[in-house]
């Protein structure tokens, strides 16, 4: 599928295209434009220098709407196809990580949202316009970014996170073991996995490694000393240290990582993973009963006027603090 396409005489980023198919209305948001690198954060306008470089006419940019606002209504064709009510307002759009951050009420500089599914993400809010000169992280306009209130979402992604843990479960751990029991088995190994280290970069090129594809590697195995429990623990420790490597990049950009907000899901269900992450980074980890779909619902609620602003949305339920 093409992620950016021309519709008539206007350009649609993927979320704009979906909204257009639902409503017949073509518009965009600053957040959406920033995902395609079409927004100039320093001057708070469309990135003319990029448009000029590629020879794009400014007329290709669709009407820019506020992130939380009516951006069209579901038309008859889409309603019939999807079983939605015709005329339902479309009032919010964003990517998965801004949605996750919204669900966790992460809005202000220094606040951090994280996930650890197939890939791992650390998403921090920056109050200054700066960047990593090596482009090892992505920067977007966060959901509450505005002229005069810089709120940039800086996204660190580690491709080899839960996918490594699931690979270990399939190929190393005892057959039929649950993730919960696998965590208990890993806890039998000492901190540091008795000298085994695993670099978890086996799921394609890593942005934080400057787009290098190093592959996953396992180091330090002693055939007379190590067993399944050591390898399982080493995998989780390797993932944690890859998080730490990326978090150091974010801190160099001026984003202090002192508290990490995360949903009670995926690898954050592992006591070993979250306790190791807290110990290595020095950050407090808070787990909440929420996910990105809740963030999307809250965003739509703000856009339609159910909530007056971000400060009026409810806090998620905190499950634990590590």
Positions of predicted regions on the chain:
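Glycine-rich phosphate-binding/hydrolytic loop that grips phosphoryl groups
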Residues: 99-103, 154-162, 166-169, 237, ...
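ATP-dependent carbohydrate kinase catalytic cores
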Residues: 38-148, 174-180, 184, 192, ...
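Single conserved hydrophobic/aromatic residue that forms the stacking wall/gate
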Residues: 2-8, 13, 311-322
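Active-site nucleophile and cofactor-binding loops and adjacent substrate-binding regions
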Residues: 9-10, 14, 31-33, 63-69, ...
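Activation-segment/catalytic-loop signature of the eukaryotic protein kinase fold
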Residues: 193-285
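Phosphate/pyrophosphate-binding loops at sites that engage ATP/ADP/AMP, CoA/4′-phosphopantetheine
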Residues: 4, 48-58, 246-258
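Short beta-alpha connecting loops at secondary-structure transitions
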Residues: 139-155, 220, 261-262, 277-285, ...
